[in-house]
Amino acid sequence: MQNSHSGVNQLGGVFVNGRPLPDSTRQKIVELAHSGARPCDISRILQVSNGCVSKILGRYYETGSIRPRAIGGSKPRVATPEVVSKIAQYKRECPSIFAWEIRDRLLSEGVCTNDNIPSVSSINRVLRNLASEKQQMGADGMYDKLRMLNGQTGTWGTRPGWYPGTSVPGQPAQDGCPQQEGGGENTNSISSNGEDSDEAQMRLQLKRKLQRNRTSFTQEQIEALEKEFERTHYPDVFARERLAAKIDLPEARIQVWFSNRRAKWRREEKLRNQRRQASNTPSHIPISSSFSTSVYQPIPQPTTPGSMLGRTDTALTNTYSALPPMPSFTMANNLPMQPPVPSQTSSYSCMLPTSPSVNGRSYDTYTPPHMQTHMNSQPMGTSGTTSTGLISPGVSVPVQVPGSEPDMSQYWPRLQ
């Protein structure tokens, strides 16, 4: 085999194109399957494709044979006239029968064996051919009636007295009869040409009508089906047969109805979930309620130095007693909204450490030019440096100045 192989598969095994596996390999596949190996493991061990392993095992489980079937199109025809007639008989007895049920009946009644039983697809093909032949027979009958009517109209036109130049009905018209008959033949030949086009048009209309043949349910049938659907979405075969006997419908139609109804229910459930999610989701992003409302309130001038800080240190008294009165203003247009620091008790609470010792340190603050003359006459502390940060034009905030002691790392930002 290795001398005449024509290819190597994806697993590294050799094969001869168009030829079956040798019997030794087939026997090994069956033995490995009996020992409990999975098809994928057998495929890797023997270097045979997974599809080949599955096909051989499936045929072995079905027929008990590991021999290959016929090669190269020499497979005998399984849809013999006897089998086709049996299939047509089963279909007439039960129009809603499935192909696999026909296959089982062919086996159980001994019409076919496991070797020559037609496949489900072959049975479906036979059923399609039978349906098309039946439609063609019905169409031919309709066309025969149309031809009969057209032929009668052609002979009606040959009656004497209908056209000018014909003889009076009371007189014998032997000379005009051949001409009349010839004229009738001409009209028949002319009408036959139009008849072909009419037949083609009727055939198209009939085909469209047959293609759109759908089952229509009465109100009582729909109510019974909906009631059963409320009870269960997946009725078993006994429930379907009971319902079929109750509302006079084939069981197959009921099965198809339930399948379509489940699909409709899934679509409706999806729309309901989407609406529910849309109603639960707000249409806009709400502003966090953690912002303090005191941001928009004017800051009053403290009456006592250090009263806003809640402290009475002497250093703070000396530092802030020399400052001029600060006008009140609002922060609505000057400060950006920021979440409050967790350690703050309000938006502008004291940022000094809680240690009571200040060590007498004070901080210089930025002074606008128009207030410089007032500030020069007052004593100020000089033990620190400051820098300012602009929030908006005209408003300055002193930025934190690190000190030598860790307890003075923060202080209350005084606004000018």
Curated annotation (Swiss-Prot):
InterPro entries hit by this protein: HD, Homeobox_CS, Homeodomain-like_sf, PAIRED_DNA-bd_dom, Paired_dom, PAX_fam, WH-like_DNA-bd_sf
DNA-binding region: 4-130, 210-269
SMART domains in alphabetical order: HOX, PAX
Region RED subdomain, residue ranges: 82-130
Chain coiled-coil ranges: none
Keyword Lipoprotein: no
A Pfam family recorded for this sequence: PAX
Source taxon at top rank: Eukaryota
Comp. bias regions, Low complexity: 281-294
Compartment(s) of residence: Nucleus
Keywords: Developmental protein, DNA-binding, Homeobox, Nucleus, Paired box, Transcription, Transcription regulation
Gene Ontology cellular component annotations, sorted alphabetically: nucleus
Chain spans, region PAI subdomain: 7-63
Region (Disordered): 164-201, 270-309
CDD domains named in the record: homeodomain, PAX
MF terms (GO), sorted A to Z: DNA-binding transcription factor activity, RNA polymerase II-specific; RNA polymerase II cis-regulatory region sequence-specific DNA binding
PANTHER family attached to this UniProt entry: PAIRED BOX PROTEIN PAX-6 (PTHR45636:SF48), PAIRED BOX PROTEIN PAX-6-RELATED-RELATED (PTHR45636)
Function: May be a transcription factor with important functions in eye and nasal development.
Family: Belongs to the paired homeobox family.
UniProt-recorded name of the protein: Paired box protein Pax-6
Organism: Coturnix japonica
Originating gene: PAX6
